[in-house]
Amino acid sequence: MALLSFERKYRVRGGTLVGGDLFDFWVGPFYVGFFGVTTAFFALLGTILIFWGASQQGTFNPWLINIAPPDLSYGLGLAPLLEGGLWQIITICATGAFISWALREVEICRKLGMGYHVPFGFAAAIIAYMTLVIFRPLLMGAWGHGFPYGIFSHLDWVSNVGYAYLHFHYNPAHMLAVTLFFTTTLALALHGGLILSACNPEKGEEAKTPDHEDTFFRDFIGYSVGTLGIHRLGYLLAINAGLWSAICIIISGPVWTAGWPEWWNWWLDMPIWGEPIAVIGGM
């Protein structure tokens, strides 16, 4: 693949975190680096193990493949390969691949002299994943509390965890996470729609300027966060959506063991409600 006109001057040595110049090269448009190699290794090994696990189950139906965590009786110990050990190895591979990918992003940022906003944003998603399969099981004393790798089995796990706390949507951190996901979608959909409407004119028309974009939102809601501000806002919303997702699950079990509706009893017990007001004169 041919380089774009400006790419060659940015393809310089240096900026690596590990390995020096050993893996400091590109394959086509893709920068490799040491962490590109480790990403490929972990991703390939994890994928092969998933398919091997599927072969042991006798199905390659993507809906039915299920790589389950060990039984709770194994606690935090190692399980036999076909009794949860495979899940443990695949979890290591997935974690290694995700972290390697983030560190590869760091190396690219260092080469270009950019900030680390992209790897930090990706780190929020990694933390959410690790909370589900590492941090929460550690706090609850068994790897069996992690979620299985499979489409239907994963959905069953989500349903079972929800019912274990009666109504999971009463979890206040879950409320925040869902709100942030929807708000992120709304903010970036509005932003994307605005840019397309301003910068993708019909044939023969001129593209509009950022002043048009700012004026639209001032007319629309009375305020414009600005062309840079909308990206800061979207970044903040998206990161918080991932982090509050991690918080909502890690407090379910290690911190709060009852049904989530019971958590709201503090609201009913607040003194502001007081005693019922007596009716005067039968009115």
UniProtKB/Swiss-Prot annotation:
The keyword Kinase does not apply. (7R,8Z)-bacteriochlorophyll b binds at H154, H174. A ubiquinone binds at F217. Fe cation binds at H191, H231. Its main location: membrane. PROSITE patterns: REACTION_CENTER. It is a multi-pass membrane protein. Keywords: Bacteriochlorophyll, Chlorophyll, Chromophore, Electron transport, Iron, Magnesium, Membrane, Metal-binding, Photosynthesis, Reaction center, Transmembrane, Transmembrane helix, Transport. GO terms for cellular component: plasma membrane light-harvesting complex; plasma membrane-derived chromatophore membrane. GO terms for biological process: photosynthetic electron transport in photosystem II. The chain crosses the membrane at residues 33-56, 85-113, 116-141, 171-200, 226-252. GO terms for molecular function: bacteriochlorophyll binding; electron transporter, transferring electrons within the cyclic electron transport pathway of photosynthesis activity; metal ion binding. InterPro entries: Photo_II_D1/D2_sf (IPR036854), Photo_RC_L (IPR005871), Photo_RC_L/M (IPR000484), Photo_RC_L/M_CS (IPR055265). It is found in: Cellular chromatophore membrane. Reaction center is composed of four bacteriochlorophylls, two bacteriopheophytins, two ubiquinones, one iron, and three highly hydrophobic polypeptide chains (designated L, M, and H). Belongs to the reaction center PufL/M/PsbA/D family. The reaction center is a membrane-bound complex that mediates the initial photochemical event in the electron transfer process of photosynthesis. NCBIfam families: pufL. This is Reaction center protein L chain. It comes from Roseobacter denitrificans (strain ATCC 33942 / OCh 114) (Erythrobacter sp. (strain OCh 114)). The gene is pufL.
